[in-house]
């Protein structure tokens, strides 16, 4: 039976684009392909599952339509089309052309009207017709053979026939969808509707009167406020009905021969998808056969190959899963077979492995099982007993495998597995390949979990952990609660899919020039971070108690002062109440900024700008700062001490920041305040191991030194080589003074300029930061570039290269992809341009300290140092040091930090010793 599908292009493109908004699909050229990928997925799913005989895709035309001409505000509220969508549309049209699918577009009419006209004609011919769109206004067209095919939230589609539309919207006829939208309006299209009438009221009115026409004739039957609303907005309601009505008389013919589904232009499809880097789409759209995907019994011989039954099937979208994939996953639970498995695995050059445990916290996690894979679609799972002695016996069987330095270890988030195995006396050694970190280097600003990567690279839907242990919450089980027979396929799949991902990601790393960075920095850093996390850091809880008491008393004093200044008591923690006190009662400014909901804006930025208006503002800011310190650090840190180890174990993250810097979490120790007496009190609470001293080493002005090297500016290089105070030297150049004559104020301004200008700060931004006039800020920036001309050249060149390549790159070839670098939107483009300047500097500095950490770790091991590296905070390394190793540790750390990279200027690290972090730094 013939079946016609009509697709609303822009509705689907927008939906696809925003579905990926938090995890955009960026290819190696820096192009955002989210809209194209989502649209192609929808198109392919429709073609393969619904099997239409006829297909057309309708687009809105360039320029205004009859609705715009009738109502200037029509769709005016809709934000400007994102540039990535504008760039995607011609490519989508190219794909449709290569598929021989007609693009339906009529000047002056929207896609709705084109589809409405064609659907009506097709329905009258008796052709089953489906309108694919998420937009509810299409409901008015449904009837007879014409149906809506609507994407559901969360996946899948719903088909709405006449009864379905009536039931969904609570109306008596699909045509009443027009009345529904005419009354309730449509914010997306800026159809005004009747003010104060929502969907429920609109449905009630339609059921009472039958539609807008009768309603407006019988308004005397209405009462109260509703009557007033309707009568005062009669013209607007009628006009809204006009705007909501889809035309069915557009000048376009229904050409079934043209709409008939045809064979695609294979060569063109391959060319387009290769250019987009949609490798799996080539297979999917061209219907290339693949081997039948079939499960293999886990009773096969332990190391037998997967049998080939000669059958073929076609992979469909992301529907590939364990149920449809040929695989051989083995549950290995007998000691004799476990030993055989280890003997077999150890003969391979590589092994993909994973651990199943009782906790996501590696420090406390107990092993539940081990999984391994050395061949795609084959994997093995070994359950581990809850009895510690029995567990160690199983783990020790695999110890020679894990500790074999000749075997490449492959994993996903391997740092976790390294720490778990270390708790059982096993050290994972040799070269490593972590798929999470590999993907981070390829697409740093997206998510790197295995489930997402499997769908993106393998077109495969993994078993979700929630399917085994249930959703997060009190009722969630532990892996220990399940039988090995319930776990083994999930666990084996992890090892197998990780191996498959490695085979996809490795060539991609090489293609993008990131393989050396991956092998020589990110992978060697992983065991360093694992050891630091296991080391943990001790906290002086008594010191924090005293700090808490002092800060709480001070906060209460400030609170009383704020209430006195305000002349009333109010909740200082409530932004709403703060706004009302400052701007209504005290009227500290004539016109205060408000949110869309009418609430006063009282964030830090606003309050900082108002500090000079009244002393209460500074007190409110101080009160907020103290409250945050207490809640985030002073009172929170003692609760995070692990009861078993007596230490805090933060997590150091390699895959979070786009620049390459490490971050830390649970707790975030990177954000502990550096300035101010209160921040110092927190640092005082970080102490070394008993009997040890705290040692801290910090790079001096590393980002400015990197800038000097990258720009090659002779004046900046000279200042660093001669060991001058760079900020005083900068001030001397700008203000044309002798370096000895530079004032404290001049040095401060030069320091702010140094760190601001190299990151593209504007005249306005510098004026705000230094609290000086824009003229003075302008002169300061001009003076800076006059004295450091190659810095300006470097900044301009960085932007040009980013525009040409779509990314910025560090000295170690770490890339930051900048999708908006060529945007027509000046604000968006400006942000990307600042990142083009910033990324190579900040990223290179981040890579330098990573190299230093790796080399310090190796020297400690080689020279038998027992002292521990415990913290990394931006450009600073911290250690707990045995007294007898003080001289040795200081020598190693400073040597490795200062020789991590040879540049045109020296790398300098300052260091200090103390009883705690504060004293040492």
Q: Language-model segments: which ranges?
A:
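Noncatalytic, basic helical substrate-engagement surface that gates or grips nucleic-acid strands
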Residues: 1-132, 136-163, 236-239, 245-253, ...
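Conserved RNase H-like, two-metal-ion catalytic cores of nucleic-acid enzymes
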Residues: 4-5, 15-54, 72-73, 77-84, ...
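Short alpha-helix plus adjacent loop in nuclease-associated cores
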Residues: 73-87, 143-171, 227-229, 380-397, ...
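Helix-hairpin-helix
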Residues: 185-208, 274-277, 540
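Conserved "right-hand" nucleotidyltransferase catalytic core of DNA-directed polymerases
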Residues: 233-385, 412, 445, 453, ...
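Conserved catalytic core of nucleic-acid polymerases
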Residues: 477-480, 527, 534, 642-645, ...
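Active-site palm subdomain of RNA-directed nucleic acid polymerases
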Residues: 509-521, 525, 848-873, 877
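C-terminal polymerase-core module
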Residues: 553, 557-560, 564-618, 786-838, ...
